[in-house]
A protein has these predicted regions:
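Short beta-strand elements that form the blades of beta-propeller/WD-repeat-like
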Residues: 12-25, 62-75, 79-81, 106-121, ...
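Long, internal scaffold/assembly segments composed of regular secondary structure
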Residues: 4-21, 25-41
Length: 209
């Protein structure tokens, strides 16, 4: 098959790769787990192969190790969470089908976030945050034209070049404001309850609500 994306575990011994391949004229996807420390029984170091059958003809465009024993697969049909606690036997622990159009994804060491279209009316977008096992943390609809989407510590950050919107992990809005300079990046501040807003010419730290 053709590799689409790959991710190395933090200690460098495990690798996930998403492949596209042709099967009877249909393009399909498979996820392959490799282990270079313990996978010696297989000359290719393969310890697990998964076909996202339940997600139909999904294409897994992004695969990521969150830490040594948790990984996540993002496809156009949903999210799959895997455990490699037993390094020679990767296990699918949670699968979340997503029917709406997925606009953005983000991930941190212990959280995963997606923004989809909101098909239920009202606000145009829906934000969903999950923990590294795939359990829902919160979901919220919003109406905000963002270009950046990140998770930093216990903050979810949505921002564009002139403003930002910030939620905590209960879905409470902690900040919603504009800036008088061009914004290139927003992150959690140096101290709890603060936000660092960075631009090409300026950097400012603000206090959250």
């Amino acid at each position: 098959g053709y590799p689409v994306d790959l991710s190395l575990s933090p200690n460098g011994t495990q690798l996930i790769t998403s492949y596209m391949y042709l099967d009877q004229g249909m393009i399909k996807c498979k996820i392959v787990f490799y282990n270079f420390g313990l996978g010696k029984n297989d000359p290719n170091r393969v310890v697990g192969i998964f076909f996202p059958k339940d997600l139909g003809d999904a294409m897994a465009g992004r695969v990521r190790f969150l830490d040594e024993s948790h990984s996540v697969i993002f496809s156009d049909k949903g999210i799959q969470f895997f455990s490699t606690r037993v390094e020679t036997s990767p296990e699918l622990v949670s699968q979340i089908p997503i029917e709406e159009n997925i606009r953005s994804i983000t991930y941190a060491q212990d959280k995963v976030g997606i923004v989809t279209d909101n098909v239920e009316g009202g606000d145009p977008y829906k934000l969903r945050i999950y923990d590294r096992e795939g359990s829902p943390v919160f979901e919220k609809t919003f109406n905000y034209q963002y270009t950046g989407f990140d998770i930093d510590g216990d903050l979810v950050l949505l921002y564009n070049d002139s403003s930002c919107k910030v939620y905590n992990m209960t879905g409470t809005e902690k900040y919603n404001g504009t800036f008088d300079f061009t914004v290139s990046k927003v992150s959690a501040g140096r101290f709890p309850g603060t936000l660092l807003v960075m631009g090409p010419q300026k950097m400012t730290e603000i206090k959250l609500q």
